[in-house]
Amino acid sequence: MNSKLRHLLLIVFSIFPILTWGTENLSTADSIRISLLTCAPGEEIYSLFGHTAIRYEEPARGIDRVYNYGLFSFNTPNFILRFALGKTDYQLGVEDYRRFAAEYEYFGRSVWQQTLNLTAEEQRQLITLLEKNYRPENRIYRYNFFYDNCATRPRDKVEESLQKSGSQLLFSNAH
């Protein structure tokens, strides 16, 4: 084998580990998927308008969870009256996606998934915000039909994560 070719191969194989170093983190970031879950309405008063949650998937780490702002206690005294008056406390819960989907399947309610087109930094910001919001001191909120509910909370967290990343929420009228 030619001496120059040997030196060239030695250089290439010496540099190769440096070039591939760090690609594990890149592939993990690329494999993260964050989606909005839109759930069909149910027949109970608390499910008449459907539901929205956020799904976070990171297969490389075995993560497939749902951030669900629609949890409440059936044991709340006068629940239906308090719900109708907008005086019900709801909270953020985190659960495995399979369990979340199984509940909707059991009740014959569809779930649609819309994957969000987020950069790695926007994803990181959103997960950080959701985890901060899931702390015991932050998870409970006063439900409001129009301004503070399971649909507005995910929207607000996505918008906040975009702002923290220096981006903004854009809507397209294209059909």
Segments predicted by a language model, with ranges:
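Glycine-rich catalytic cores of cysteine/serine-nucleophile enzymes that process amide/ester linkages
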Residues: 29-109
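Activation targets extended, charge/polar-rich intrinsically disordered C-terminal tails
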Residues: 132-175
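Short, flexible segments with low predicted structural confidence
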Residues: 25, 97-98, 125-127
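Second-shell loop/turn segments in exported
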Residues: 42-43, 109-117, 136-145
